[in-house]
Amino acid sequence: MTSSTFRLAVIVNCYNYAEYVERAIGSVLAQRRDDCEVIVVDDGSTDASWEVIRQTGVRAFRIENGGQRRACIYGLDQTTAPFVLFLDADDELLPGALDAIIPHLQPEVAKVQFCLGRVDGGGQHLGSMVPHPELFCRVGDLRERVRRTGVYVSPPTSGNVFRRDLCELLRDADYDNAVDGIIILAAPFFGEIVSLPEELGLYRVHDRNLSGVGRGIDADIIRQHMQRFRNCIAHLNRVMPRDSKQQPVDIDTTYFYLEKKLILASVVGQVGRYRQLPKLLNVIIGDYFPPARKLILSGFHILIAILPFSLSRHLIEVRYRPEKRTGAALARALTGTNR
């Protein structure tokens, strides 16, 4: 089958993941789909990744280290497939994943997203899927949700298949090193989003994730996330298809940005951080999540805004570090015995 007849390209991007990349590649080859091609891009790894990749026999390229976004663009240039899945080298597809995904790859679809099971560095399951399947059922108008909150329910990078024109937006995202920004955020404005509630892949959580999942809470990282989000929203507003229903996104009124401002204020010990609560609570109450979730989110943000700074920081860690999401960890955070 020639490159022009493939319906989907899976681009595996790798940097120093010698211990995982063979499993990632093997999980794609095991799908046994003639209408899918596999392309591996090694982003100048300094470990044994390239040797491992070559042994698999797949079509692979080794380039000078330039970051995930550049590696994925390089891979995109090697295929003409109309849909692309960027698979991180530490993640995997589960058996039958592409059989479930490919029938949905239609011209009007901008993105197909699916759930990922969370595993640790050793492959042990960590509990519930991401996102939770129930959240996929509460979609509503995703464009309006992005305008109001700055986000929508979406899996990490490896849980998405993008139409090619969305991937082309990466070329102008020189403010970003990753690929899970503009193309995820812009997808609802470019076509339909198909959400599959099945667990079709594995997402590895460890301290080397590009997303930062599994790391501690750090003020500089929060600031970086806020600046990245600001750049991403500006990019979205530039490329958003213009019609009467698609107004620009105002970053300063979105849930994502307001929440990060409050979290940053709590982490650095900013006096008067509670003054940020009204705007944030207004966005939470207007969201489409069920009342119980609104109550939990509202309670969390009220607590981190009024508790002593040390307790507030502990509570933030409980929420944002998966390994700390236990009843005991929450009790320790609230009583100041988290350390």
List PLM regions with ranges.
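C-terminal subregions of glycosyltransferases and related glycan-biosynthesis enzymes
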Residues: 148-150, 156, 177, 204-339
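Short aromatic/hydrophobic "clamp" motif used to bind/position activated sugar donors
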Residues: 84
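Conserved nucleotide-sugar donor-binding catalytic segment
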Residues: 77, 138-216
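Flexible acidic/His/Gly-enriched loops in nucleotide-sugar-dependent glycosyltransferase catalytic domains
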Residues: 68-71, 98-104, 108-166
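Acidic helix N-cap motif at the loop->helix transition within catalytic regions
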Residues: 19-22, 46-54, 92, 96
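Glycine-rich, basic loop-to-helix element that forms the pyrophosphate-binding segment
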Residues: 63-79
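Short, well-formed alpha-helical segments that are part of the catalytic scaffolds
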Residues: 16-30
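A conserved acidic beta->alpha catalytic loop
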Residues: 27, 42-51, 88
